[in-house]
């Protein structure tokens, strides 16, 4: 009996000893599976963040109603969309020009080619599709120029979208004159610093938050004679009253990039005009045409970038209590006629409602109408014409 018990103990000990590697193997296998699952989740999260950054290409030619010319939604410092006149947008003063002289979102350029309407200088660049939007992608240092049909006006605005995930992604824009090397130029994302530079060094620059490198940046330049202002998203990074930035028929761009960290650009919009005295124009001409009121894509929701234009309208109406206006929405001919008509009507109504709520303007002083594509001010056969037709007008009553 003792012998049998002893043998049983030996067998159990053998089984436990021999199974130990199997248990360890199971533990190791489980650990590997958990590690892989965590890595997969991290990859999925990264992809979702990139996708989130690229969503909402409101500057594309897919809709006929007046849209923003930039990609993505306006964000506050916390990453959430905000209303006009709120948060970081309270003191924002960029107003887009009202006569577009160049626009290209590369929607008509074949993927893999260099953009049809830009002038190639050097480097490795191509049109690439990224999250439903076409971009100029530079995988190495490169140069190109934007040719203009006329010299850049004394009062101008320039807008485009930039994406570059690392400090190796930098952009410079010069004025295209014969003496451009002696003039100021715009430099963006030079180790996160953005602003105005010249041969002597920086004229004015600001270090933008690191988070800007992690999402699409809306870049804007506003010029009025020698006065140049540069903006990245809601932040003004240069405010120079005596800049030497010149005017010519082209805008040269220089890109710094890396094969693993490509620089991406899209939604170029160059226009004449900018900030001006709205009341004087309304009295002289009986109407004001503005492209400074922007809406979320396919919606009547007013975007935060509209703050300066809405503020000027609201202040004008409060200062002139006898003034009455009709707010009229217009679109291009892209999309269904009925849809454009309805959207332009709702957007005009949104502007009216905002002025009543924010500035306490009496409803009896405001009218709103939508005309869709029925009253174009330019040909719908060109990107510039379609941009000019997407507008809001104030008509003096």
Language-model features: locations:
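Glycine- and small hydrophobic-rich membrane-insertion segments that are intrinsically disordered
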Residues: 23-90
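Carbohydrate-binding surfaces in secreted/extracellular proteins
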Residues: 106, 160, 213-241
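Secretory/extracellular carbohydrate-interaction modules
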Residues: 130-201, 209-210, 272-274
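Periplasmic OmpA-like peptidoglycan-binding domain that tethers envelope proteins to the cell wall
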Residues: 330-397
């Amino acid at each position: 009996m003792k012998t049998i018990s002893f043998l049983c103990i030996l067998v159990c000990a053998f089984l436990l000893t021999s199974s130990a590697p199997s248990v360890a193997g199971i533990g190791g296998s489980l650990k590997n599976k958990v590690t892989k699952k965590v890595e997969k989740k991290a990859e999925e999260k990264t992809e979702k963040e990139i996708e989130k950054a690229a969503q909402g290409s409101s500057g594309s030619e897919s809709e006929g109603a007046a849209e923003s010319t930039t990609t993505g939604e306006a964000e506050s410092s916390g990453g959430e969309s905000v209303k006009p006149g709120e948060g970081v947008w309270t003191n924002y003063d960029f107003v887009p020009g009202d006569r577009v002289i160049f626009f290209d979102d590369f929607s008509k350029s074949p993927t893999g080619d260099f953009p049809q309407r830009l002038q190639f200088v050097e480097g490795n660049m191509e049109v690439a599709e990224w999250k439903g939007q076409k971009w100029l992608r530079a995988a190495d240092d490169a140069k190109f120029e934007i040719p203009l049909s006329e010299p850049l006006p004394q009062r101008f605005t320039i807008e485009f979208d930039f994406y570059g995930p690392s400090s190796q992604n930098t952009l410079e824009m010069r004025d295209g004159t014969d003496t451009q090397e002696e003039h100021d130029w715009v430099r963006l994302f030079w180790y996160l610093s953005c602003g105005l530079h010249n041969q002597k060094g920086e004229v004015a620059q600001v270090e933008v938050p690191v988070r800007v490198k992690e999402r699409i940046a809306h870049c804007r330049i506003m010029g009025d004679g020698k006065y140049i202002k540069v903006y990245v998203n809601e932040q003004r990074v240069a405010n120079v009253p005596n800049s030497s930035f010149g005017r010519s028929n082209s805008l040269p761009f220089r890109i710094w990039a890396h094969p693993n960290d490509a620089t991406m650009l899209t939604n170029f919009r160059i226009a004449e005009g900018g900030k001006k005295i709205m009341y004087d124009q309304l009295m002289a001409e009986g109407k004001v045409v503005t492209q400074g009121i922007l809406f979320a894509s396919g919606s009547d929701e007013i975007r935060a970038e509209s703050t300066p234009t809405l503020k000027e309208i609201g202040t004008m109406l409060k200062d002139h209590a006898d003034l009455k206006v009709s707010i009229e929405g217009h679109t291009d001919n892209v999309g269904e006629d009925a849809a454009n008509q309805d959207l332009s009507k709702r957007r005009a109504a949104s502007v009216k409602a905002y002025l009543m709520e924010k500035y306490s303007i009496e409803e009896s002083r405001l009218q709103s109408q939508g005309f869709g594509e029925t009253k174009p001010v330019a040909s719908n056969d060109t990107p510039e014409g379609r941009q000019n037709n997407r507008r809001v007008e104030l008509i003096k009553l």
